[in-house]
Structures are given as C-alpha cells and as structure tokens.
C-alpha cells in the first residue's frame, strides 16, 4: 500500500542496546502502527519511524505520519477496543477498531507504555517504550 500511495518510509535508529521483547509481539506492534500510518497518510507523503533511549532501561519507538490527525475528543478513546475515529468512519478506510487496542495490550504485556501525540490536521506521532535487555 505504501508503494501504491507513493509514501516514503524513513527509519532513524538512534538507540543503544537490544530490545527485551517477544519478537512476534514486537513485530505485531510495529505492523499495526505502520499499517495505520500508511492507511491514514496522504498520497506522496512520508512516514518516519525512529528509535531512541529516553530512559536508560527502555527504548522508545515512534511512528510519525502526516495524515489527518486525531481530534482531542477521539484521542481519549483511541486505544479502546472497536473505537474508530470520526475521520476514519467518514472515509473508505476499512478497520475494526482493534489494531490500537491490540498494540496497547501487547506493549503493556512487554512492561512498556504507549501513547499518541498529535496536532489535528498535521498528523500523529504514536510512540511506545519497551525494556532493553
């Protein structure tokens, strides 16, 4: 889908250490966040995936898009099961509203945290932390 929409995916690794996480859970988290970023980004845009060490024992991963953003009302519910934003319901984007709930569950099971920062109409930055080995 990223090729069809001509979206560049840019990876910026800036962390030290190995991630202490179940590889399948980590892969599922990344797939869900990247799939959403692609789905809600405009054609001919970019998605940034970056890693950093904000706290010595954790790695922080961000997935940043330049899609429609998330309204303040929707932000409080974005990780709830079956929740879809108003903008998602108004488009042809398919989804069950489970992807971000799964992300939250998996990140919590890995002893990490997850959140979102955004500016409506300027995209979203989803982030999560997981422990380092």
Model region roles, listed by residue range:
Residues 65:
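Acidic ATP/Mg2+-coordinating residue in the GHKL
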